[in-house]
C-alpha cells in the first residue's frame, strides 16, 4: 500500500545564508494493507516531514514514495489529488480550513469530493461530530472560532468520515483533554 525507497529530504534555508538542513536520509518503509505503523522519535526528528512527503505536501529530495503503486515523487498534481481523495487520509496536528466554511461541511468535504450525495455526507458528518462531543449549536460555525481541542476533534472527524485505505495520523490527540 505504502512504500518508501531511499527517501531523503533536505530543506534550504534562504534566510540563513542558504544553509541546507538534512531532515531525513535514506528512509525505507513498506506498509501493507491492514498494518498499523507508529513513527516514534524526538521532536524535530522528521516524523511530520515524512508524513507530509507521503501525503504529497512535501517533495522528497531523492528516492520514491509509492501509494497504491503511484509514485508521488513523479506524479502529476491531479494524480496526487486523486490519491488524497480515495486512498490516503491525513489528520494533522493542526486544523487548516477556509474560515467561512461551517464545521458540518468541513467534516463532510471528503465525502462530497468523491461524489457522495450531500444529504448522506452531512448525516455521516453529524454522527461523527456527535460522537466526538462537538455541540450541535457549533456545527454551522467555522471551526476556526473553536478551542484547540474542539478544532482537533473536528480534524479527527474529517479524517474518519471516509474509510480511506490508509490514514496518516500526525499527533492527532496532542491538543485534546484527558477525557
Language model segments and positions:
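Conserved ABC ATPase signature
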Residues: 142-146, 150
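Short coil-to-helix segment of the ABC ATPase nucleotide-binding domain corresponding to the Q-loop/switch region
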Residues: 101-109
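Conserved ABC ATPase "signature" region
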Residues: 71, 120-137
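Conserved ABC transporter NBD signature motif
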Residues: 63-71
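Catalytic Walker B motif of ABC-type/P-loop ATPase nucleotide-binding domains
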Residues: 167-170
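Helix-to-loop junction immediately C-terminal to a conserved catalytic motif
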Residues: 55
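The feature captures the beta-strand-to-loop junction immediately N-terminal to the Walker
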Residues: 40-42
Amino acid at each position: 500500500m505504502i512504500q518508501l525507497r531511499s527517501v531523503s529530504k533536505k530543506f534550504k534555508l534562504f534566510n540563513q545564508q542558504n544553509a541546507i538542513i538534512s531532515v531525513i536520509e535514506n528512509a525505507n518503509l513498506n506498509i501493507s494493507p491492514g498494518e498499523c505503523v507508529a513513527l516514534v522519535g524526538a521532536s524535530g526528528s522528521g516524523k511530520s516531514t515524512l508524513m507530509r512527503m507521503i501525503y504529497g505536501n512535501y517533495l522528497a529530495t531523492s528516492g520514491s514514495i509509492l501509494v497504491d503503486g503511484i509514485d508521488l515523487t513523479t506524479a502529476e498534481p491531479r494524480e496526487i489529488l486523486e490519491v488524497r481523495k480515495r486512498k490516503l487520509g491525513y489528520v494533522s496536528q493542526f486544523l487548516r480550513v477556509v474560515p467561512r466554511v461551517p464545521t458540518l461541511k468541513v467534516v463532510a468535504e471528503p465525502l462530497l469530493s468523491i461524489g457522495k450525495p450531500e444529504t448522506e455526507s452531512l448525516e455521516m458528518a453529524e454522527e461523527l461530530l456527535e460522537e466526538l462531543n462537538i455541540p450541535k449549536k457549533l456545527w454551522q460555525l467555522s471551526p476556526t472560532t473553536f478551542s484547540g481541542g474542539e478544532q482537533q476533534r473536528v480534524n479527527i472527524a474529517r479524517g474518519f468520515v471516509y474509510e480511506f485505505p490508509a490514514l496518516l495520523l500526525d499527533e492527532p490527540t496532542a491538543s485534546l483533554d484527558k477525557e
